[in-house]
Amino acid sequence: MKYTLTLARTNQDDDSVYPEQDQKPVADPLDKQIEKNVYFGKLKNLLHKAVNWGRSNSLWPYNFGLSCCYVEMTTAFTAVHDVARFGSEVLRSSPRQSDFMVIAGTPFLKMVPIIQRLYDQMLEPKWVISMGSCANSGGMYDIYSVVQGVDKFLPVDIYIPGCPPRPEAYIQALLLLKKSINKERRPLSWVIDDQGVYKMNMKSERELKRKDRISAVEFSDTD
């Protein structure tokens, strides 16, 4: 029997399609419009807020999982956690009907072309959440068959640490994604506004809550 080994895209031409995380802070594009035309600038600001409000409160996840972190993700959809409070309870079985994809589990090398194809089938705007240590950095699988991080072949918006993360961590990631979407600036159409995507420069929650972690001296049982 003949076997075919499918490798990840490593050519230089493919790097432009799925670049690694390369973000740089830029100024809000609405500031220039407000200076040129105060009325039109305020109108665009209201339109962006209305569109972002609708997108952030109706996030449909793609029903996709790779490993044990997927079990923790589906636990968040039970009545105990009630993820429907955030408008993200509608699991979609097709990437064309979903808003974001959660890479929950170990990204094996053979799965990379499949994940990339599913990501390409998603309609804009779309987002990616990396859930678990294996998806973030390969975890404990530092071997030839596991990609050391999803951001090697997909743009990632939110990282969830843990092995595996708790369902509460997934809910916190949804809240962070909602916060990021509310700060985004996307073109309203192909003739109006700049044809570029401006995203929020999010800082690590570990650094933001560093003082709170250091000041904690007593720990209680999570249960």
From Swiss-Prot:
According to Swiss-Prot or TrEMBL, what is its membrane topology? Peripheral membrane protein
Task: Write down the Gene3D superfamilies for this protein, in alphabetical order.
Answer: 3.40.50.12280
Q: Which GO terms describe its molecular function?
A: 4 iron, 4 sulfur cluster binding; iron ion binding; NADH dehydrogenase (ubiquinone) activity; NADH:ubiquinone reductase (non-electrogenic) activity; quinone binding
Picking any one GO biological process from the record gives: electron transport coupled proton transport
**SUPFAM superfamilies attached to this UniProt entry:** HydA/Nqo6-like (SSF56770)
Location within or outside the cell: Cell inner membrane
Subunit info?
A: NDH-1 is composed of 13 different subunits. Subunits NuoB, CD, E, F, and G constitute the peripheral sector of the complex.
Protein name according to UniProt: NADH-quinone oxidoreductase subunit B
Provide the species name: Blochmanniella floridana
Lineage of the native species?
Answer: Bacteria, Pseudomonadati, Pseudomonadota, Gammaproteobacteria, Enterobacterales
